[in-house]
Amino acid sequence: MTTLASSYDPSSFESRLYAQWEAAGYFVPSGKGEPYTVLLPPPNVTGTLHMGHAFQQTLMDALVRYHRMRGYDTLWQVGTDHAGIATEMVVSRNLALEGKGQTRDSLGREGFIAKVWEWKAESGDTIERQMRRLGTSSDWSRSTFTMDPQPSAAVNEAFVRWYEQGLIYRGQRLVNWDPVLKTAISDLEVENVEEDGFLWSIRYPLADGVSYEHVEHDADGNETLRETRDYLVVATTRPETMLGDTAVMVHPEDARYLTLHDARIVLPLTGRHVPVITDDYVDRAFGTGVVKVTPAHDFNDYQVGERHNLPLVNLFTVDAKIIDPREQYPDDEYPVVDQGIDWRELNQVQRRRTGQHFAYSIPSAYVGLDRYEARKLVLAHLEDEGRLVETKPHKLQVPRGDRTGQVIEPYLTDQWFVKMDALAKRGLELVESGQIKFVPPNWINTYRHWMENIQDWCISRQLWWGHRIPAWFDEAGTCYVGHDEAEVRAKHGLGADVALHQDSDVLETWFSSQLWPFSTLGWPDAQAMAERGFARYLPSSVLVTGFDIIFFWVARMIMATDSFTGQVPFRDVYITGLIRDAQGQKMSKSKGNVLDPLDIIDGISIEDLVAKRTHGLMQPRMAEKIEKATRKEFPDGIIVHGADALRFTIAALATHGRDIKFDLGRAEGYKNFCNKLWNATRFVLMNTEGARFTGVPQPRTEAEKWILARLDKATAETHAHYANYRFDLLAQSLYEFAWNAFCDWFVELAKPALNNQDADAAASTRHTLLYVLESLLRLLHPLTPFVTEELWQQVAPRLGITTATISLQSFPQPGDVDTSSYATAEADVEWLKSMVSALRRVRSELNVPPSKQVRLLLQADTADDRPRVARLASQLSFLLKLERIDWLDAGQDTPPSAAAIVGELTLLVPLEGLVDMDAERTRLDKEIKRVEGEIAKCNGKLGSATFVQNAPAAVVEQERARLNDWTTQLTGLREQRAKI
């Protein structure tokens, strides 16, 4: 008796099986065979598993399990990223919730970092526990945290080497600044959001008594205005930054302003004189064609300022309040503003003298105001002075921090940078030479664009949590870089009397993440490298990641790995699309459309789902709308699907497109697939009680040969789809074989043999059932590890297999069974399937009870049909409940019958005693209409020049053959219709 449960319930065995796998050490690299390494993009230690993680990790796990079963020495390197900004925010929020009055600042640097480590010890492994629930077969003993001692040593080594090579420098540049976090952030952490704003037009008076002839024209070129003006009109969306303007700019070929080149304007509200400069950057058609230039608070203006040597005027404090510039300088170094000095020359002098950007007096009314309060006051003062010309609505692209939601400020600060030109050139060579392959290949274009337009990389962050920059300063500001302070003192001969303080900044997390391919393998410590298999597992085989971090992570790993090890980090880069909801919308907390993969796996009630989606919203007013939409979409919550159903869904959706729409209905369908597999296994087990077989079956029936040939084909397709990273086609191929070929057809076709008097045929059929099922379970295992393991444990012993787990079984190979002589059997069974389908459709349409036997008449056969009927008569009779089969001669009169056509063979079921004639006429009319529709489809394709000229010749020929078959069927159906 089988001990397999009567129904499929994934919650009853998935967690149990995973615990067994992990305890047995099945995921640990074997050290034998060709190495196959996969790198997990390290998720934030603060994070929880989301659909993007589940999507990529499912594909990675399938690749790892597939190669493990093929005998590869598999290493799936996992770990977590320390996530500087995110972690500081989480711990700061937890401190507030504790209600003890402790804050980041009150604890101080050392105290706060201690709190972070406490939090990490308590909650830092959440995402790894969730990954286990998904079924990830990674070696957890190798799990690495980017702040662990080994990767931290790698970070210091990398920084020191690049600094000594002249690739790392400290300088003053414009960066993305979050005024809430008070740190620079990367472009990836900035979301550009379209918002409603305003465009203000302001009069800037010309200095030195200069005026010009202003002329305006209508759309037809007719002059509409001519007047003498002593001012320019400048349009801006940020009037508060005019306090930091150091020029206004016109296009050098703009005829309206040719007389004003090198003139000066008087900056409103400040009285300072700034130059009118010319630059091709100006769009003459936008507004008045006059642009204000604020190099310290706009990235484009910064580039203009570099070209024209303009001063850099910083307006803001670190929390985006208007600054008192005197705070930036010692009293004896504060620059004296003289309206007669050319600001561009003064800037050169000032930089040489202090190494600082230019500072100046700001009207005291604005000092200390938040930037938006300052905006209101600036506009009020401009209105009072008659300088505000126009205010009109304007759509803006507003840069907001993805964590704080605050508007990001382009901000001028002292930061650490990496020179990227030489590194990027080499990184591009490695890809274009084919040493690294992108899949799909079109992503090379994105990679190339970024590498050819690269800028120096800002690597410093104004945080406490992270890898502190290994640089020390003496009281004179001299910088020393080394692995630690002792090394710095020894290297530079600095005694104990020389006070040193370490740079307070930390490195951004991408700096440590770029070292992931080799820091996890022990670099730079020789002993650790030997222990962790540096020489064996680098380069890794494939990186599975999203297109959004091709530049931020993929490119940097390529450059860093080459720079520090002389190798590529990986051979293949498989770029996945972005998971969206069923309507194509990005999943986000604010939209209330996030699906938690664990809720899909284990289920969730509607009340808990609503609570999860409405808790902690940045916009609480959205809660009611989100609750309403959630209750409408999931009135009963989300049912238990199990990890296998989710994994198979993910594989089926993994096209090579940019966006992937996740439909929960697909997951329910694939849960049914797992259930179908479960029930088919129960059938096989119940019909093979006491059986013990070994080796490859020796088929006695055509059905066995057919299924073995189909198995061989499915196996070959499986290998091809893995090689090409076509998980969608892989899922489609396996689904088709498992559901249709095995569960629907072979299980059905096996029944006549199992119930036959021929003991040899019955035995071989039992062997084939077990053999094909066991092979199918191995084919499916990388995608659906849990259900296949649970079923395989029951099936394997009946084939003499005694190993403990399917996960270490060999993966099926094409040619495991020699099917080269099975062509006739394949054709016979395909014909049999057509016969069964046609006759079952007739029985269904006539409402003939399944148990009632019918007579079958055959007519208009080909030379192959009679021998086939003779060979397959017992199967036909068993499957179709036939009383008998009779042949009619060509042209012989037939009784009123229900008809179907298979190839050129006419199938007739006499109607006497079965149905009334009116019902049969209706059925035939319906069938004729269906076949006419199929003929129309074929004619549509064959009538298309595009299809005929561009489709492969075999496909076109197949379509012509289909048209011929449908036409033959239509002729037979019309003849039968005419008879009744």
Swiss-Prot record:
Primary location recorded for the protein, binned into one broad class: cytoplasm
Binding sites annotated in the UniProt record for ATP: K589
EC number: 6.1.1.9
EC top class, as a word: ligase
Subcellular location: Cytoplasm
Subunit-level organization: Monomer.
Job of this protein: Catalyzes the attachment of valine to tRNA(Val). As ValRS can inadvertently accommodate and process structurally similar amino acids such as threonine, to avoid such errors, it has a 'posttransfer' editing activity that hydrolyzes mischarged Thr-tRNA(Val) in a tRNA-dependent manner.
Sections of the chain in a coiled coil: 914-978
Gene Ontology CC terms: cytosol
Catalytic activities: tRNA(Val) + L-valine + ATP = L-valyl-tRNA(Val) + AMP + diphosphate
Name of the protein in question: Valine--tRNA ligase
PANTHER family (UniProt xref): VALINE--TRNA LIGASE, CHLOROPLASTIC_MITOCHONDRIAL 2, VALYL-TRNA SYNTHETASES
InterPro entries associated with the record: aa-tRNA-synth_I_CS (IPR001412), aa-tRNA-synth_Ia (IPR002300), Anticodon_Ia_Val (IPR033705), M/V/L/I-tRNA-synth_anticd-bd (IPR013155), Rossmann-like_a/b/a_fold (IPR014729), tRNA-bd_arm (IPR010978), tRNAsynth_Ia_anticodon-bd (IPR009080), Val-tRNA_synth_C_sf (IPR037118)
NCBIfam families: PRK05729.1, valS
Motif segment ('HIGH' region): 43-53
Motif 'KMSKS' region: positions: 586-590
Any one GO biological process: valyl-tRNA aminoacylation
GO molecular function, one term: valine-tRNA ligase activity
Keywords, comma-separated and alphabetical: Aminoacyl-tRNA synthetase, ATP-binding, Coiled coil, Cytoplasm, Ligase, Nucleotide-binding, Protein biosynthesis
Annotated family: Belongs to the class-I aminoacyl-tRNA synthetase family. ValS type 1 subfamily.
Gene3D superfamilies linked to this entry: HUPs, Isoleucyl-tRNA Synthetase, Domain 1, Valyl-tRNA synthetase, C-terminal domain, Valyl/Leucyl/Isoleucyl-tRNA synthetase, editing domain
GN (gene name): valS
Annotated domain remarks: ValRS has two distinct active sites: one for aminoacylation and one for editing. The misactivated threonine is translocated from the active site to the editing site.
Domain of life, per lineage: Bacteria
